[in-house]
């Protein structure tokens, strides 16, 4: 993901997996900075590690940076399951675009 910026919706989704007793690997796409990506992957990783330091120390969460590769893949259903979560209304309403606007108005 882009994680631009980290917000309560991200935390909610991660908590869903942790509550199922599963560990979480957060993959940050290595994208160039832009208006919609105002933070570098290194800045995002540092922020996530600060926000999740307790879970990282317990080895429940790992944060990595991956190359930004876009491709079309066939046979996507092979080897993994798609699990859908339905966030509560307060989480569903979160807009990273609006959060970025507020951050950069300061």
What is each of the regions a protein language model found here?
Residues 1-106:
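Nucleotidyltransferase catalytic core that binds NTPs
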